[in-house]
């Protein structure tokens, strides 16, 4: 999801690679990977975001996800 961030690309890519490695190690099919990642997002929103901000944060995340899928013709 292309977006300006306070985190370096290097840090983001390192964490992403580690998460992909876990999914590959478990031979996780795409649908299960999406379920797990979706549950992780839900858990983060419910445990780390104030209740009044959760819906807006979820919408922002969903919008960014949809934009990144539309904007990436390489996949």
Swiss-Prot record:
Q: Supply the source organism's classification.
A: Bacteria, Pseudomonadati, Pseudomonadota, Gammaproteobacteria, Enterobacterales
- What Pfam families has UniProt attached to this entry? DUF1414
Q: Which domain of life is it from?
A: Bacteria
Stored InterPro entries: UPF0352 (IPR009857), YejL_sf (IPR023202)
Q: What is this protein called?
A: UPF0352 protein ETA_12580
Q: Which organism is it from?
A: Erwinia tasmaniensis (strain DSM 17950 / CFBP 7177 / CIP 109463 / NCPPB 4357 / Et1/99)
What the record says about family reads:
Belongs to the UPF0352 family.
């Amino acid at each position: 999801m292309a977006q300006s961030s306070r985190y370096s690309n290097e840090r983001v890519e390192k964490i992403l690679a580690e998460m992909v490695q876990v999914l590959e190690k478990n031979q996780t099919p795409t649908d299960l990977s999406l379920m797990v990642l979706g549950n992780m997002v839900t858990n983060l929103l419910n445990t780390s975001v104030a209740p009044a901000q959760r819906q807006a944060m979820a919408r922002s995340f969903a919008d960014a996800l949809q934009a990144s899928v539309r904007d990436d013709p390489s996949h």
